[in-house]
Amino acid sequence: TMTDDEIADLLARTLDDRRQLLKIMSMNHYDLEENSRMELLVEFKVSYGNAMKTIMAMLEKFRKDMDFEKRQEFVYSYFPFMFGIYPYTVVTKKQKEAMKLAGVDYTYSSLYNLTFVAVRRMLRN
């Protein structure tokens, strides 16, 4: 078995190593779809499906306490999270200035840290 912290660490390190992918995933999917050839879109969807299956298999192997429904619930929380995390971890100088001028008190955090905390929370629910 793996602890929640071990799984969270593994997934956080995995995402931290794939920043370019996260940047692409955070873009407007309708624009990407509109401007992509079908074979490239299919290739992406195959990879995406394989990633989902890999997470399901990891949870089945290392989290015996999670039934299929709980594993699926995790996957369908984790993957949407992945699509949106990049903009929270890479903030431009202009965005920082705009937030300051808007009076937004935003705490900047690393991709690893945000992912670790979120995954651990998802696993415990």
Question: Residues of each region from the PLM?
Answer:
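Short secondary-structure transition hinges
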Residues: A8-K53, Y106
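C-terminal peripheral helix-coil segments that are non-catalytic and often amphipathic
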Residues: K53-D65, F81-N125
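A short small-residue
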Residues: L32-N35, K70, A98-A102
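Short, well-structured alpha-helical interface segments that form or flank functional binding sites
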Residues: E6, N50, T54, E69, ...
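Amphipathic alpha-helical linker/stalk segments
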Residues: T1-D9, S26, M58-R63
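Amphipathic alpha-helix face/heptad-repeat signature
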Residues: F44-Y48, F74, L111, A118
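Hydrophobic alpha-helical connector segments
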Residues: T1-L21, R71-Y78
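Short, solvent-exposed secondary-structure capping/transition elements
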Residues: Q20-I24, F68, V90-V91
